[in-house]
């Protein structure tokens, strides 16, 4: 065979008297791999098909003082809460888990603060929650923490229009009671 620079020879030889046996059939691993993948997807899907009463969006700076106690208080009310400390594990895709949590929650609690409006991830979550709210698939419940109405208006005029609870006016327990009443009242109406 002639190539661009030179030639190549190929050949084979048959050894007389050698016992020629057919090769054993090659097993195609694809069906087994597909079955394993389907089973894994079913197991993951089963775990991820949970519905949540509420998704809690917040800035990490507000976690200690407001968000962690609020998430726990909501659980004590018997609500299913999507909160990062409850749901995220090492190796998880942050974006996928957040998107999934938002999509599978009936209500979105947003703890608005100066730190909240300064972060990219919280804005990403807020965009998702507002999209779900506008589409009628979720109810947005704002909590204002150490932030004024003017500051909320500057950041998001549409959020300033929503009735909100302020951490300066209500205790965490009172806020949790109010959120639980709204969620449980909506469940009765459904």
Name these PLM-found stretches:
Residues 52-54, 160-163:
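Short amphipathic alpha-helical segments
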Residues 114:
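Short, conserved catalytic or interaction motifs in soluble domains
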Residues 148-160:
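Glycine-rich, charge-decorated loop segments at or immediately adjacent to ligand/cofactor-binding or catalytic sites
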Residues 162-170:
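Short secondary-structure boundary motifs at beta->alpha junctions and helix caps
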Residues 2-111, 121, 130-139, 145-148, ...:
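Conserved N-terminal substructure of TIR/SEFIR domains
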Residues 118:
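Glycine/Thr-rich phosphate-binding loops of Rossmann-like dinucleotide-binding domains
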